[in-house]
């Protein structure tokens, strides 16, 4: 199987290493010329892409693709997500052979929903412009005419991106929140395992990828700050946003099991 990976950031770089044990011909894209030498050993070929790149020569020879793009400092959500999706969908519209596409979205598309639990079938109407862009991007991939799988990721944590590091940034800060909102996280290991699971089983449609641990922001970050001997965040008592818990039951029913179902405070 010829597989092209769009995006070699935090998740993409880790995935490329995991794919080395698989019988795939891997093609890699990057927007940074300085990363070509680093990525060469992880794939058959590395392509530098920009706004003028013709995606047809990259995508059409392949049997599938994984889209893991993320905005850089100078790129907007529209440029990174929506424009990329439109170009990919336009490239795939006349494809006759089977093709599998997996895109990692975000549970932030669920913002503004006034329900305690959110499933993949919950009607969405994002409030922010970025949320609207992410939801539109999902729709473009789902309507692209190929077998498409959307993984909505919770807050990512793992090596070099720990929850403790995040707590340090929040320490002593006044938060525009009561802290009573549930959290929805996912460990890097489970993201990689879920992507491979979706590839192996050709899952189609939208799947939430969050763990089973939804302790509140106040409980989580107070615990983390105590471990690090830091002042906890200062929570506001006035907020109209109660937050929500994202359900992972659909991907579990498909057969996926989590390596990190619960947060291990101080061990991430």
Write out the residue ranges for each language-model feature.
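NAD(P)-cofactor binding segment of oxidoreductase domains
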Residues: 60-102, 136
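Conserved N-terminal Rossmann-fold NAD(P)-binding element of oxidoreductases
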Residues: 3-7
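C-terminal amphipathic/interface module of NAD(P)-dependent oxidoreductases
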Residues: 45, 49-52, 232, 239-268
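Conserved Rossmann-fold NAD(P)-dependent oxidoreductase catalytic core, especially the SDR/UDP-sugar
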Residues: 87-127
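N-terminal Rossmann-fold NAD(P) dinucleotide-binding loop
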Residues: 12-13
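Catalytic helix-loop patch of NAD(P)-dependent Rossmann-fold dehydrogenases
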Residues: 114-150
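Mid/C-terminal beta-alpha module of Rossmann-like enzyme folds, strongest
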Residues: 192-247
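Substrate-positioning beta->alpha
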Residues: 156, 162-166, 175-197
